[in-house]
Amino acid sequence: MHTVESLVMRKKNNILCIAMLVGLLCGCGKKYQYIPKDIETVEVEIVRFDSAQLAVRIDSVKQDIEKLYADYEEFMPMYVEGILRIPTEDTAYLCEMYAQFLTDTVMGFAQTNALAKEKFANVDSLQEALNTGFSRLHYLFPDWEIPAKVYLFVSGFNSSVMYYENVVGVGVDMYLGSDYPYYNQAAAN
């Protein structure tokens, strides 16, 4: 059962994807758009929700999840309902699934979580790329509201990017390389 918020988030994701596709198709006829080097710099904040997620301990899952709700009150409900597709009020099920998510080696979640933690330990280059990208986006579309924050999260192979109101989330486990072996296994299931 999906909530109104999750359906709205899906609709906004679909609209964003369509807008990006239209932009790509319309831009294909032009050679390129000149963007000056001295454009206004837009800085977005990267929020390391992924680090907090992976710091959850098996022996204190319930308390750690409650702490995630307290520390990330804006993002945690969107993550639980929109990415994990678990109703926020079903804490017992969330705790059970989260413990499995942290320890599962059959589907590769434990291995994937460890690799994501290692690969995204330093996000300085990602920060620079996001600032450059959003600066260019702001130059081309000055009326579009640039997200204030970009949350990094681990999705359990559920989502690579999410957009909701003024928040963007990036599933770091979906960016471990095209040859990452657990992608094929997840796709088969």
Predicted regions and their residues:
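Bacterial N-terminal signal peptides that target proteins for export
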Residues: V4-L16
